[in-house]
Amino acid sequence: MTHDLAASGLRFGIEEEFFLLDASDLDIVRSAPAGFVAACRDTLGEHFAEEMFECQVEVASPVFSTLAEAARFHGQARQRLAHLAMDFGLRSLCVGTHPFADWRRARSNPAAHFARLFEDQGRVARRSLVCGLHVHVEIPPSHDRMAVLQRVLPWLPLLLALSASSPFRGGRRSGLASYRRALCGEWPRMNIPPALPDEDAYRRHLALLRETGCIREDGQVWWMIRPSSHVPTLELRICDACPRLADALSLAGLFRALVGEALDADPRALPVARDACLEENYWQALRYGCAGRYLVEGRCVGAGDWLEMAWRQCRPQARRGNEWAYQHACGLLEETSAARQLRRYRRLREAGQERHPALRRLVEELLEENLQPALAG
């Protein structure tokens, strides 16, 4: 298979979150060992960040022009983080939810920024032991980010369905493809953004939230897609963390293509309007993943047809540099991470393994997937 990675798309960046596990039992650690965070900063530099729990870290990329650049950086970053973790008796795991970890064991990060989150959100924050994939796509200054957001928004449940990797919670099947997004729904300002027509309206809304004490800072608006508060991008936040790097790259490419199409669209021909079916499609993606039934253009379609519709509506300039992303996503329709985890778990139980050993083996397989090369061939 050859991969078209022409460097002519919008610039973008990717953020991946990881759990830190005890190498001996593959459960989350309460705290990282002394020296681990410093070693990560020495190795990954400004691209490494701590997260809201001490058993979590994040890798945030530089700015990319091509998916090939993203594959090289994140492939190396995953390897480096994994090797550092092993040096400290840990393993690093990229997945939406840990299959058997108990969230009550997770220790909150005492840094002031995170302490305020736990103070404000209480048990909602404590329960949110999840990892996500965030993708930033640069928006030219000549375009209004909120207008672009509203045009891209109806497609986001499709991206969630493709990314779903959190079917387990606390050692049990959750019944959802993305339990992570169900937990996100407990937070304020973390689901579907309001129908604000432009950035002026967005800024007025943020000012109201600040002035009334609803938020402490602009970054506390955590919608599933939002204008970044510090860089000129739209930030996709709906997706689960992807065990396989290739899946994360595919989602980044699809999002970049959809944003590119929204930028190129004639605003007179594409009015900003809220899709009445958005909430139902979001539930279908959260519950069923790619097996969901989606309401699109007045009819019910499967995820495969919806993905084809998304790609068809992107003009050549929006597709350019993202062709591989679409091809890979077509393969994801056959089996997402959530579906694969459930299939493997079922296979292990049918072979006679007890619940916990089967879940531990599932974590071992996810760790192996984390280090699979992307864009090979």
From Swiss-Prot:
SUPFAM superfamilies: Glutamine synthetase/guanido kinase. It holds the Pfam family GCS2. Keywords: ATP-binding, Ligase, Nucleotide-binding. It comes from the Bacteria. It catalyses: L-cysteine + L-glutamate + ATP = gamma-L-glutamyl-L-cysteine + ADP + phosphate + H(+). GO terms for biological process: modified amino acid biosynthetic process. Its EC number is 6.3.2.2. It is an enzyme of class 6 (ligase). GO terms for molecular function: ATP binding; glutamate-cysteine ligase activity. Belongs to the glutamate--cysteine ligase type 2 family. YbdK subfamily. HAMAP family: Glu_cys_ligase_2. ATP-dependent carboxylate-amine ligase which exhibits weak glutamate--cysteine ligase activity. PANTHER family: GLUTAMATE--CYSTEINE LIGASE 2-RELATED (PTHR36510:SF1). This is Putative glutamate--cysteine ligase 2. The lineage of its organism: Bacteria, Pseudomonadati, Pseudomonadota, Gammaproteobacteria, Pseudomonadales.
